Amino acid sequence: MAVSGIGGVFFRAKDPDALLEWYRTHFGVTMEGYEPWQQAAGPTVFMPFASNTDHWPEAKQWMINFRVEALDEFLSKLRQAGIDVKTDPAWDAPETGRFARIQDPEGNPIELWEPPVE
């Protein structure tokens, strides 16, 4: 028997309400009480990294990755909102897609992923 998907992502925040509002504003993640956010079906990568990875800041134990469509348009909106966006052509590959990285207001690392078109 196997699990059928990820049912939630839970993490500590200094100001949970303000951080949830940031995710609602910039990512469309809506939570009302414990009413789940409905997301589009798609691939999910579950992968431990070596403890000395430089894929995200050492002070953080995790990084969340969000699937997005039209990455360039999404990044443009984030930049217009004053969010620092990092891209690197070395992160992108035809077989895996395109990537960008940002941090939320509390410094949590976020990777944005536009999967390859099939």
Where are the model-predicted features located?
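Vicinal oxygen chelate
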Residues: 1-5, 11, 32, 75-118
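Short amphipathic alpha-helical segments
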Residues: 5-7, 60-64
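Short hydrophobic/aromatic beta-strand micro-patches
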Residues: 10-12, 65-67
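Helix N-cap motif at beta-to-alpha junctions
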Residues: 14-16, 69-71
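Amphipathic alpha-helical segments
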Residues: 15-29
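Secondary-structure boundary/capping motif
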Residues: 18-20, 63, 99
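Short amphipathic alpha-helices within nucleic acid-binding modules
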Residues: 22, 72-77
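Conserved short beta-strand elements that form part of the metal-binding/catalytic scaffold
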Residues: 27-62, 102-105, 109-116
